[in-house]
Amino acid sequence: MNTVTLGGTATINDLVSVARFGAKVAFSKEYEERVNHCRAHVDRFSHEGKAIYGLTTGLGDNWKKFIPEKDRETIQRNNIYAHTCAVGEPIAEECTRAMMFVMLCHFGSGHTGIRLETLALIRDMLNAGISPIVPGHGSVGYLTLEGHIGMVMIGEGRATYQGETLDGAEALKRAGLKPVVLSSKEGLILLSGTTSVTAFASLAIYDAQTLSLTADIAGSFTLEVLKGTLMAMDERLMAVRPHPDQINTAANIRAILKDSPMLERYRGHRVQDALSIRCMPQLHGPVKKAVKDAQATLAIELNSSVDNPLIFDEEDGGVVALMGCNADGTYAGMASDNLCIAITDLCKMSNSRIDRLLNSLVSELPAFLNKNADFNNGLMMIQYASAGLQGELRILAHPAVVDNLTTCANQEDYVNMGYNAAKKAYDSMHLAKYILAAELICDGQALDCYEDKRCAKGTQAIYDLLRTKVPEMDNDMPLTPYLEAVAQQIIDRAYIRTVEASVGALKF
């Protein structure tokens, strides 16, 4: 089992390793030292009784209320209670784990003032496999979902552990862990920041990387089985419009289809291909750029201090608590909205290619790739499913961060809505994988419609992997199991690994 050690720069791959693949988490000596150093300042501030938001005062519009030192532990617990109000179906376990990992990254920055023992409990919960039950709706960018994680930490709420859903206290007990008694400022720390936005957006970015490369793979296969031409992928065309991601996409397609016997057999069959094939570099390229832009934003966000207030050492040896708004989620939210647009565009082109594969008027193949038309429908309905998914993606492409409502007695008269953006980005990736799965299934069936099935080395590898889950279809059969199986192969990066083993590394 891999271990991710925190203390340096954390990456999206680190987050996915922990959240999705169960890697363990450890703290470096540097991580522990900076946490303890900052906590000492918070303890001193608490004893001195200075007016510091969330430490000696209430939250939101209650910032005007001073909290006596004797009541601060009670207030921290009450803060968790009050903010635990998300609703609806629970988020996926990998999303909860991603949130907990982000907490460790953000709160361990050395500027929040959280205690090391509180962070250690989050780490130990991750390593033990305790996953708080977190409802998925009702966040403007922070606070409510995070409250449900805090509830389990204090021995309340609900969590899953070893396949069972348990009371939070019982889950901790079975794992040999004890609840934490929150100290000054810690309730606020656990609730504040861009935890959920960063978590969902990071998972979405990882999947968007996977999908954008898989689109190159599926699109290449489609080009080949539709007797296309590589002319539009020529390096000279790319060189005079030198967007790096356009250049890389064309290079991927050329590599996958290198020395294709099928393309050679049909050389000159068409003057040029339809736009959904000819224009892959010009659409897949911008999608990759959008993913890279989001990745750059989230790489910063994952390694940021996002609480309010934040604690800083001063050059003269003093210490200051600065009230600000690093907890705002617009950076990650706007990046997520852009991801939704990008992945919808990617799938728009995939859907056009699916139509060309199934439409005998343009494919020069049997209608709906149906090899036994007397009693069968072929793959007609796979296009309906894909079109429905595209409709959902278009809805999710509407930006979330442009929305606003005033909250908290006008003290928080603007809210970022970053969580809604990040959640729909995560959901969009889930939908998009099925559209690419549909294209790959159609590709495989199209190849089977030829008597001479000799194809490029890259596409042969794709076909062979596809056939481990999806049989050649001579008669109608339920398609859902095959869509699910291929979609899982896609998200597992099986097609990327298989193609790279055959033709070399793809460019992203």
Language model: regions and residue ranges:
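Short alpha-helical scaffolding segments that buttress acidic/His motifs in well-ordered protein cores
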Residues: 15, 79, 83, 95, ...
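C-terminal auxiliary extensions adjacent to catalytic cores
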Residues: 2-23, 27-34, 38-41, 45-46, ...
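A broadly tuned "polar low-complexity/structure-edge" signature
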Residues: 97, 124-128, 465
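Short secondary-structure transition/capping motifs
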Residues: 27, 31, 64, 68, ...
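Generic internal hydrophobic packing segments that stabilize the cores of diverse globular domains
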Residues: 39, 76, 96, 115-123
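FAD-binding core of FAD-dependent oxidoreductases
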Residues: 53-75, 82-107, 133-156, 164, ...
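Conserved SET/PR-domain catalytic core that frames the SAM/AdoMet-binding pocket
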Residues: 49-51
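FAD-binding glycine-rich core of flavoenzymes that anchor FAD
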Residues: 110-139
